[in-house]
Amino acid sequence: MPYLPIAPVAPVNDLQLREPLPAVVVSSPPTIDGEIGEGEWQESARREGFYDRDTGLPSDERAEFWLCYDGKNIYFAGRVYTDPKKLVAEEYRQNVSLGGNDQMRLSLDLLGQGTGGDEFGINPRGATEIELNGGRAAKTEWVGEFEAQAKRTETGWQFEARIPWQIVSPAPAGLRDARFDVEWFRSNKSNTYSYAYTRDDRTRNPQWAGVNVPKIEGNDQFLLLPYAFVGVREDEKFESQVGLDFKRQLPGGLSLVGTINPDDVNIENDILSLDFSYFERLAGETRPFFQEGQNYFRTGFEAQLFASQRTSNIDTGIKIYGDVDATTRMGALAVADFGDQVASVFSLSRRWSPQLVTSLAYVRNDQTGLYNEAGQLNSSYTLGDTTYYLLTQFTDDEQQRSGSRISSGVIMDTAKWYADLEYTEVTPNFFPRIGFAPERDFRRVGLFTRYGEQLTIPGVLEWGVGLNLSSSHRFNGAFYRDDVGASADVSLLNGLGFSLGYSAGRFEQFHDRSFSIGATYPYNDPYRLVRAEIAWSRFQDRERRDLELGLQYRVTPFTQLSLSNEFVEFDGDAETQMVLVATHDLGKFEGVSFRLVRRNYDYNWNASYRLSGRRGTEMFLIVGDPNSRTFTNRLAFKIVTPMTLGF
């Protein structure tokens, strides 16, 4: 079948870099009711016209937005002209993920340098999502909330929103030029469009010119989240725990967060898949203290000098993070397990120009017999589509002595092509004790490249192919490993997605290979989909078969099921893992959930009731232990009561 012609992707000099949007102060704030009345937004700045975020092609449907502010709030409204029958609007709550929903998002960077930004999303039912600069834990009192009202219309949908200045990442009060963008996700195209086509370069986002940022009242208070937990087990063993999380905004745009006896009673740890690996794997971090401001603590990429999962037991912790000024970001953290371990982290990055960025970090582990220090100094320089980088890391360990890791490379990133050519060397004694660096003692040259296009083949939304090559030797010259891999994926307009993968290589004395094929339908609906992947492999001279099945199903508008099943046969030995999760909303702020985990012949389940996601007291009732290998007969109750403390 012949290719359809497609307009050429704009080069860097022809990006859709919009003119500054004047920051308009309104004397009469609009009413937030979802009705964009005639003349209601006439004082505001209005714009229209959106471009495909990946290709720069203009949208074939129309949308417009309004933006203004006063001393208390930022006001944002939008109207989308589309088929209302094709809208996806599953969510109706506040501060939730809007993935897969039709939505508009306002991206706002008050410092105006492209170092970060906050995002505020609204769907056609008025549900909201907040993604604040630096990362936040799911605590309404800390994240904040904003009001939005939306409605479907005969010509599409529209919304109005009021965003308090108090929840926006802080900037010094006074007149400034901020940066912004507006993104629009269309479920009928499974595609995202933006007001400015910048190829994801925030330094090129349009200016919101002449914003007079007000002094935010109330930021000098301590926000306290004390909690209490009581529980009883089958053997009548009584459990209890109390603790406190606290936060305060500091002068100059920094935030202070602390914890005493951290609240992780009902935190469900991530579950690792059954994938094969020669090296250690690390599950994701789910504890709120470490999630808060996590993007300010950058201690590496492939190798991380600090991995919070290494500090599994902490009694207290404190961190300070934020934007020191428009070009400088910092984070400082210390956690302690009294009588055993104190871990500390410092991270600093600076954007010297739109092209040049440098960063440094220092990590220290104070522990008897296990003392460790680690540091890094990184820099990158971007010219057009090409970025040159140098990453250096050093460690000094009480047992392993001194070591280093150095990576240098060049990245080319265009609308269709991505390529990364890198040289890496890691000494045998490189050892970040409270970090994550599973490979040591090698020199490697590697290349990864990917090519992809959108809407160039009839019936195909997007397709892509990738290739990776690498060769590694030990420091003494001995062979270590060679790898080659290829992948391909395609997403059809009917919602069906396919993927293929092949890899082959030699790891020390073993000759390995793997071939996989996967399918998802529909890939553009996170609430209702099925997926399957099967792989045929040979590792360590042994045959392996993997089968993974997954299901997401929206039983009712308030009930969601999620199921994943993994089956592995490795050299005649079988292994299985199943995770079943069911959630049901009793209201905007109430819900029940159930999780069942089966690992071979071990079963664990837990059920819970929650009253959370709103301002005020939160309550949780938990049956079982979510992180036990097998079922624990336990009944527990937790209460969290927010407070404020001013001086």
What spans do the regions from the language model cover?
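Exposed, low-structure sequence patches enriched in small/polar residues
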Residues: 313, 321, 391-647
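Outer-envelope beta-barrel architecture signal
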Residues: 72-74, 116, 157, 174-178, ...
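Surface-exposed extracellular loop regions of Gram-negative outer-membrane beta-barrel proteins
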Residues: 217-254, 343-396, 518-529, 548-567, ...
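Short beta-turn/strand-loop junction motif enriched in small, turn-promoting residues
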Residues: 164-168, 231-233, 365, 452-454, ...
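Catalytic-domain carbohydrate-binding cleft regions of carbohydrate-active enzymes
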Residues: 161, 179, 250, 255-256, ...
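Structural preference for beta-rich elements and adjacent junctions enriched in aromatics
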Residues: 1-345, 349-350
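A short, polar/proline- and glycine-enriched secondary-structure boundary/capping micro-motif
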Residues: 85-92, 129-132, 170-172, 267-269, ...
